[in-house]
């Protein structure tokens, strides 16, 4: 009862193929890849301005 055997995975694969068809699965995987790529780009875009915000502060001379 604990783990899936090879037959379980084959049955799941057949059901997925019947539901989505052969043409739809690559399309779905492409959409997932685009989403991951967009997420990574968004994460690096947020980090980039933080490193660019360096301010040089000059010390005031008082006598």
Curated annotation (Swiss-Prot):
Q: Which residue ranges does the record annotate as region Disordered? A: 42-63
Entry keyword annotation includes Iron-sulfur = no
Q: Which Gene3D superfamilies match?
A: 1.20.5.3310
Record key words, sorted:
Cell inner membrane, Cell membrane, Membrane, Protein transport, Translocation, Transmembrane, Transmembrane helix, Transport
- Its quaternary structure? The Tat system comprises two distinct complexes: a TatABC complex, containing multiple copies of TatA, TatB and TatC subunits, and a separate TatA complex, containing only TatA subunits. Substrates initially bind to the TatABC complex, which probably triggers association of the separate TatA complex to form the active translocon.
The gene name reads tatA
**Major location, coarse class?**
membrane
Species name: Rhizobium leguminosarum bv. trifolii (strain WSM2304)
Task: Give the residue spans that cross the bilayer.
Answer: 1-21
UniProt protein name:
Sec-independent protein translocase protein TatA
Which InterPro entries does this chain map to? TatA/B/E (IPR003369), TatA/E (IPR006312)
- UniProt membrane topology term: Single-pass membrane protein
